[in-house]
Amino acid sequence: MAKSVRSSKKKVKRVVPDAVAHIYSSFNNTIVTITDRQGNALSWATSGGSGFRGSRKSTPFAAQVAAERAADMALEYGVKNVDVLVKGPGSGRDSAIRALNAKNLKVTSITDVTPLPHNGCRPPKKRRV
């Protein structure tokens, strides 16, 4: 019986020197997505997916760990420079940007793209603890 000879094709990772880091930080979680300029996702990580559960997901340290994990995956694509788009009111915004900077990604610009209503929907009632 003849063996079929199969040529193995390795998937070539494309090189993306410039990328965009989208940091969405809510009151409960932080999501870091690194995309190319067209918006195609290269890597992403969340605080919850990084092993933090419950109230620890919303901490700045959890956001830092998520940003480091996303940066490690993005470095495999050859990312050197990132523009940072920050969205949301959460506590992990600053620490996620610092973590990207510490991973030898040059932060070229930081833009706040938090959506602000022009008096749209009624917000949730204030907490009484």
From Swiss-Prot:
InterPro entries, per database record: Ribosomal_uS11 (IPR001971), Ribosomal_uS11_bac-type (IPR019981), Ribosomal_uS11_CS (IPR018102), Ribosomal_uS11_sf (IPR036967)
Keywords, alphabetical: Ribonucleoprotein, Ribosomal protein, RNA-binding, rRNA-binding
SUPFAM superfamilies assigned: Translational machinery components
UniProt record similarity statement: Belongs to the universal ribosomal protein uS11 family.
Gene Ontology CC entries for this record: ribonucleoprotein complex; ribosome
Function: Located on the platform of the 30S subunit, it bridges several disparate RNA helices of the 16S rRNA. Forms part of the Shine-Dalgarno cleft in the 70S ribosome.
GO biological process: translation
NCBIfam families named in the record: PRK05309.1, uS11_bact
Annotated organism of origin: Francisella tularensis subsp. holarctica (strain LVS)
Lineage start: Bacteria, Pseudomonadati, Pseudomonadota, Gammaproteobacteria, Thiotrichales
GO molecular function, one term: structural constituent of ribosome
Gene3D superfamilies, alphabetized: Ribosomal protein S11
Pfam families per the UniProt record, alphabetical: Ribosomal_S11 (PF00411)
Record text on subunit structure and interactions: Part of the 30S ribosomal subunit. Interacts with proteins S7 and S18. Binds to IF-3.
Name of the protein described by the UniProt record: Small ribosomal subunit protein uS11
